[in-house]
Amino acid sequence: MGKRIVIALGGNALGNNLPEQMIAVKQTARAIVDLIQEGHQVIIAHGNGPQVGMIQKAMAELTRSDPDKYIPCPLSVCVAMSQGYIGYDLQNALREELLDRGISKGVATVLTQVEVDPADPAFIHPTKPIGAFMTREEADRMVAERGYDVIEDAGRGWRRVVASPQPVSIIEIESIRDMVNAGLVVVACGGGGIPVYKTEGHHLKGAAAVIDKDFASCVLAQQVEADTLIILTAVEKVAVNFGKPDQKWLDELTPDQARQYIAEGQFAPGSMLPKVEAAVKFAESAPGRSA
C-alpha cells in the first residue's frame, strides 16, 4: 500500500531565475510523478528564499523610481507573490508529466496562510536568509545603505536575513486535507506560508517575516497525517563538519544522534539546522513516521 508523503522543496533548488526554475520544476515533476506512479499520495511544499528576496528587491527598486506613486511592498505580500509564480510552474509541470504518462489526476496550488505569534522572539533576532548570495563588500553596502541584517551562509557567501517565526497553525488546513483526501496532488505552504497573525475579530494581518518552509512542512505533514516527510536541498546530504577537510556525509540519523549534533553546533541556523530539527520533530510525532 502506498504512503502519504510530504515533499519539501528547497527554494535554492528551484534556480535563481525564471528559466532556471522552469528546468528545475520539470526535473522535480518527473521524480514526484515516479512516486505517484508507485501508488503514493504526494503533497508538495516549497521554499522561496531566493525568490522572495528578488521580488522584494524589484518592488523596492520600483518604489525608489517613483516614491510619490509607489509604496514598499510588505514582506507577507512578497511571500504571496512567490507562492503564486512558483506554484504556477510546479502545478503545470506536474500536470504535464502526469498527462504524458497517461495518469488522470488533478493538481492544485493552495494560497496558504500560516499563523505566527507576533510575540515570537524571532522578530527581534532575524535568522532566515533570503535573496541572492553576496560578497562581503556587497553585504556591507546593503547594511550601510538599507539597514539590512546579513549573515555569512555556510561558506557560500553573504545573504540578507529576516525574521523567521515558528508556525502556529495552517489557516487553510481543512481545504488542503479535503483536497488530499479527494486524491488531488496539492502544492501548499509555499515559502513556509504567508505569515499572518490574528488581530481583532477574525482579521488576519500580514507579518514582516518569512516562515521557514521546513518547520511549516513539518506542521503540514503532521496535520495531513503523512507517513513520511522528505526535505530536498541543493546539497547531496546532511553533513557534519560541513565545508571542512574532515566533512562527513550522513546517510541516516536517529533523533538522539541528531540532537547531539545540534548541541555541537554542526548545523547552520537558517540553513541545515531547521531541516534537521523539522525531521526530528516529525519522526517523533507519531509511531512509524520517518523523515
Where are these predicted regions, by residue range?
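A glycine- and small-aliphatic-rich helix-loop capping segment at beta-alpha/alpha-beta transitions
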Residues: Q21-K26, A58-K69, I124-A132, G201-A209, ...
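Acidic, metal-binding active-site segment of PIN/NYN-like and related structure-specific nucleases
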Residues: Q222-K244
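N-terminal glycine-/serine-/threonine-rich phosphate-binding loop
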Residues: M1-A45, M54-S65, D178-G183
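Ligand-binding beta-strand-loop-alpha-helix segment within the catalytic cores
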Residues: L62-V186
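Short acidic, glycine/serine/threonine-rich loops at helix termini
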Residues: N17-P19, G53-A58, A119-H125, K198-E200, ...
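Polyanion-binding loop/helix "lid" in catalytic or ligand-binding cores
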Residues: I23-R30, P74-L98, A163-V180, V186-P195, ...
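Short beta-strand segments at enzyme active-site cores
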Residues: V6-A8, Q41-M54, G106-L111, V186-C189, ...
